[in-house]
Amino acid sequence: MKNFTTALYKHATTDTIVSGFMTSIGSRLYENEAPEGAEFPYCVYMVVSDVKDWQFVERFRDILVQFSIFSSASGSTEVKGIYTKLLTLYDECAFSITSNTLIWMWRNSLTTMRDEVTTPAGTLGVWHYSVDFDVYLEDT
């Protein structure tokens, strides 16, 4: 799993010119959770599930990975722009993974919401886009 999450992060940091994703979140991409007091906007990614699969002698992994985009902008323009850049970066993409071959990665679903977050400065309205991707890997 570590090889996959490392490759996922590396893909974001090496493809900044094409998608602009990392620039749009100020390079604030975190695995599993953001640090307390993280500046907006930011994105958190995590593996939701990792299911082993096989066909005869080939071994596969069916992974669901979730990206959560957070923006404190008053309107939804910023979070929508970040979402578009995330799709450009990861939907039907290709990248190298040590010990695995990426068969596919595509967007599964999008859930949009507006949350209220309590900060030392008070309550803040935050846009939260939760984007799920299906990933299929072959073990090598």
Place the predicted regions along the sequence by residue.
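Short, acidic Gly/Pro/Ser/Thr-rich loop/turn segments
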Residues: 52, 138-140
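Extracellular/virion structural assembly segments
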Residues: 56, 72-93
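Oligomerization/assembly interface segments of phage tail-like spikes and tubes
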Residues: 59-73, 86, 127-137
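Small/polar-rich, solvent-exposed N-terminal microdomains that initiate assembly or binding
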Residues: 1-57, 93-104
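Acidic-leaning, charged glycine-interspersed low-complexity segments
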Residues: 88-138
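Short, conserved turn/kink motifs that form compact alpha/beta structural patches or helix kinks used as
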Residues: 44, 60-61, 70-78, 108
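Short, solvent-exposed beta-strand/turn "edge" segments of beta-rich domains on protein surfaces
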Residues: 54-60, 120-124
